[in-house]
């Protein structure tokens, strides 16, 4: 399932984050890539111990926790601290699938990359190219969202970032270890949850809502791996 989360960050928050990102020191993005990915990766990344990255990452995590859409779509158990990349001057990242398991820096905690997320910090008209191309069962999708928007998609998806030929593309990326590993099952739970929320508004107090809610939680109980 691919899902856009609009306005995860406010314009003021985006502006403050951009200022911090523009002033921060960057490193070659291949430093964090495996041998195969490094062959197709040409971008810059903030070091994992970057103070600016940690501060912005904490803001993103706070916003995700307050986003009912993100929580419903991803059913997070653990979220890897957000990372940050920068594309310019032809920078690109060719077709690849992300590692299945990541370790939270400074810990022994493992995070399975069930769901990938990208948060955009540059407006689409600030750069040419730079589309996130995701290929999966839902087809071939080209993603280039407004600053402050986020996109979530399965961690199993083949994806790439097209070359940025003008301007600079700033973004954050990270992975969520979901309570439900299967994308198909997460989609069923998400659709059911969204319908329950809509029916709650249209028909508050309807006894059928309790039954539907019970079905949702029984499915979650059956499928979750907490």
From Swiss-Prot:
Needed co-factor(s): Fe(2+); L-ascorbate
Supply the enzyme class, top level: oxidoreductase
Q: What detail does the entry give on cofactor binding? A: Binds 1 Fe(2+) ion per subunit.
> What PANTHER family would the database entry show?
PKHD-TYPE HYDROXYLASE YBIX (PTHR41536:SF1)
- Keyword terms: Dioxygenase, Iron, Metal-binding, Oxidoreductase, Vitamin C
What lineage is this protein's organism placed in?
Bacteria, Pseudomonadati, Pseudomonadota, Betaproteobacteria, Burkholderiales
Cite the GO molecular-function annotations of the record: 2-oxoglutarate-dependent dioxygenase activity; iron ion binding; L-ascorbic acid binding
Name by which UniProt lists this protein: PKHD-type hydroxylase Daci_1172
Q: Can you supply a Gene Ontology BP term from the record?
A: DNA damage response
Positions of 2-oxoglutarate binding: 169
Binding positions (Fe cation): 96, 98, 159
Q: Does the keyword Transcription apply?
A: no
- What Pfam families would the database entry show? 2OG-FeII_Oxy_3, PKHD_C
All residue ranges annotated as the Fe2OG dioxygenase domain in the record: 78-178
Q: What is its EC number?
A: 1.14.11.-
């Amino acid at each position: 399932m691919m899902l856009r989360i609009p306005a995860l960050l406010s314009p003021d928050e985006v502006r403050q984050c951009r200022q911090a990102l523009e002033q921060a020191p960057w490193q070659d993005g291949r430093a964090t890539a495996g041998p195969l990915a490094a062959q197709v990766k040409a971008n810059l990344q903030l070091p994992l111990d970057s103070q600016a990255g940690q501060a912005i990452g904490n803001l993103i995590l706070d916003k995700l926790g307050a986003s009912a859409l993100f929580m419903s779509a991803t059913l997070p158990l653990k979220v890897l601290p957000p990372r940050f990349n920068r594309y310019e001057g032809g920078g690109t990242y060719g077709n690849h699938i992300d590692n299945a398991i990541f370790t939270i820096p400074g810990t022994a905690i493992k995070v399975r990359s069930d769901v990938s997320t990208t948060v955009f910090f540059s407006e689409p008209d600030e750069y040419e190219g730079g589309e996130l191309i995701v290929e999966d069962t839902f087809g071939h999708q080209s993603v280039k969202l407004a600053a402050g928007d986020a996109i979530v998609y399965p961690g199993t998806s083949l994806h790439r970032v097209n070359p940025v030929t003008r301007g600079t593309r700033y973004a954050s990326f990270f992975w969520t270890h979901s309570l439900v590993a299967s994308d198909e099952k997460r989609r069923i739970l998400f659709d059911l949850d969204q319908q329950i929320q809509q029916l709650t508004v249209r028909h508050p107090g309807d006894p059928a809502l309790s039954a539907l809610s019970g079905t949702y939680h029984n499915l979650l109980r059956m499928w979750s791996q907490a």
